[in-house]
Amino acid sequence: MAPPLFLLSLQLLVLLSSPSAQAQNISLGTSLTTQGPNNAWLSPSGDFAFGFRPIDGNSSFYLLAIWFNKISDKTATWYAKTSEQEPQPIQVPSGSILQFTSTGVLSLRDPTNREVWNPGATGAPYASMLDTGNFVIAAAGGSTISWETFKNPTDTILVTQALSPGMKLRSRLLTTDYSNGRFLLNMETQRAALYTMAVPSGNLYDPYWSTPIDENVTNQVTNLVFNTTGRIYVSMKNGTQFNMTSGVIRSMEDYYHRATLDPDGVFRQYVYPKKPSSMSQAWTAVSIQPENICNAQTKVGSGTCGFNSYCMFDGSNNQTSCVCPEQYSFFDEVRKYRGCRPDFELQSCDLDEAASMAQYEFNLVNNVDWPQADYEWYTPIDMDECRRLCLIDCFCAVAVFHENTCWKKKLPLSNGIMGSGVQRTVLIKVPKSNSSQPELRKSRKWKSDKKLWILGSSLLLGGSVIANFALSSVLLFGTYCTITRKDVQPLQPSRDPGLPLKAFSYAELEKATDGFKEVLGTGASGIVYKGQLQDELGTYIAVKKIDKIQHETEKEFAVEVQTIGRTYHKNLVRMLGFCNEGTERLLVYEFMVNGSLNRFLFSGVRPLWSLRVQLALGVARGLLYLHEECSTQIIHCDIKPQNILLDDNFIAKISDFGLAKLLRTNQTQTYTGIRGTRGYVAPEWFKNVGITAKVDVYSFGVILLELICCRQNVEMEAAEEEQSILTYWANDCYRCGRVDLLVDGDDEAKLNIKKVERFVAVALWCLQEEPTMRPSILKVTQMLDGADAIPTPPDSSSVVNSFP
């Protein structure tokens, strides 16, 4: 009996030599474009197409892909990836081209004519899109195959396709996001196995499903086969076959077939009717593996769903869903695999038993468990005592009770599952409904520091730099107000417990700064002085003395501060209070021990690459909070190294909101005069157009390059003239494939050259002249984190307009 792979290869050669296939051969010198009618090569029947497929939800970018051409949603079965050790899906912008050159080379090029993908086949006489869904490139002579998509699968296999040991399927991140996902089907010499993976590093956790292993036989697996009857099985060298799927197989004549490793980690075999009907047509899963992925557990990692969530399986449609417990919410409603976070402040370990019982209670949920997350257990015990022991334990977030046994668990919770077979009752600790504890909801949880509580009414917790903006905008936006100082009554100290700002007297701040003696720096609207409060801790502060004041009404100011004053983020400098006494206007901030990024980065000693990476991510996350996580969007308008401060742990914090703009709900742009600092301002500042959050994205792109290279954007004394302006030079280095020149002498960065290239590409996307071409700051953070693939950035001349 011939091995299955040999039979498949023989069948493929027959197809290549048939008249119908030859009629569809792709000739040398042929090309495809992203737009227009010539964007794909079809198989003889028209069932499959190979070419440019628009990204779902973003028609400006394309995959080089194969798809079911006669199905309305054009379901992709293959898409090109990079040739890196951890291949990433390739996305190209409009204007890209795929050439099958006269020398027999298939080459994908972006609008700048830079090659972004090449399968490595040379001297090919022709290529073909076959009716099997396989795209093949013939070897010289035309009798054998040099390269084919069936040997380079992504997340899907088709009928007649086989996977041999060493080949793998990688799930997508989401159905509409083709970035590498969290699950892998790996063909090994001893078995076929499904793994959970770490994103973005790609390391494997424990397998959650595999074929049986015979310890007495080595190299026992031959292939995973999707045969012409619709069966999917793993063939062994001893002749046995292990069925991967066991669904009711539909006919090949009436149905399209595929098998996909889906974003939820389930390997599903699907069918789709070829003939249109009055019924709604869709892919139907006829078989799955594993039968219930919610039962999968890993010793490391979050499990099937993200941390602090639990998995539910619906057997009626073979679908899984991830759920947050009550009073928890997803970090990202779209990317639910990132897990859940509490919508409340976690229990302080300073609370005694009485206080804990007064402030916290439990939500009870049946048939739920988080296996492997317990750190303590008791037996025999009743539920009331289990409840009490968890309630007084500040580490205990959840207690699980079953048959007189109690398990205590702390965050993060992993391997969460709900099902009728889970004979457990969970007690989830939450604040009591009448508790005065504020919910954090969309902001990061503030972990209270015992020393700060000592300050009591002197420094209320949770002060926000956003309140800084609210006050600064009131004091500085003279363009938009006509009310004089005498019309404004001094702001009284807040009696609202939700307004965590202290109203300082001028005398207090004059004493704290020793008569405004030590200057820390100058901002857009005043001078910043170092000070020290006369409290029990001797807290150091930074006091900004505002000049050139113009006001809006006190009522509008109070409403705005009360609206956003409770928010907080680790990457924003925290505002502690203010002074609004007579004609004096001062702002009080937390003091940043390590000064500004400007001084830290350009002082002559190159910081570690790993630290620069964390600083870049911190600035991006701070901007993400301003742009997309606040209830009211904030445009900073003056992002530069001088306005990025570093605390004692070298965490980057955005400061100086004196030029910021606040957008109303549903407002996406504003019109205002030029703001910002030369070398960091976006081109649209010099045009009569609306200003959007993309001006901050542009400024971040400049800072990102400065962090990569440890030099300022403009250095007219540079050794080489082409290196004088960093944005020019970085663009040239990237286009020439020499980003290593940007980190010359930095051994740590060169060891991470792939990440350097990734960061440079992100920066060049941020520096696009057209604002709509720049990614959102959310997309920027995803690309920096490695969660999203990065298309090749167009060659933009935006930097010219940065220096009027």
Swiss-Prot record:
Belongs to the protein kinase superfamily. Ser/Thr protein kinase family. Residues 1-23 form the signal peptide. PROSITE patterns: BULB_LECTIN, PROTEIN_KINASE_ATP, PROTEIN_KINASE_DOM, PROTEIN_KINASE_ST. The keyword Transport does not apply. Residues 24-458 are extracellular. This is G-type lectin S-receptor-like serine/threonine-protein kinase LECRK4. Does not seem to be involved in resistance against the herbivorous insect brown planthopper (N.lugens, BPH). It catalyses: L-seryl-[protein] + ATP = O-phospho-L-seryl-[protein] + ADP + H(+); L-threonyl-[protein] + ATP = O-phospho-L-threonyl-[protein] + ADP + H(+). ATP binds at L520, G521, T522, G523, A524, S525, G526, I527, V528, K544. It comes from Oryza sativa subsp. japonica. It is a single-pass type I membrane protein. Residues 480-804 are cytoplasmic. Residues 24-150 form the Bulb-type lectin domain. One of its GO terms (biological process) is response to other organism. GO terms for molecular function: ATP binding; carbohydrate binding; protein kinase activity; protein serine kinase activity; protein serine/threonine kinase activity. The active site is at D638. The chain crosses the membrane at residues 459-479. CDD domains: PAN_AP_plant. Residues 349-426 form the PAN domain. It comes from the Eukaryota. The gene is LECRK4. Its main location: membrane.
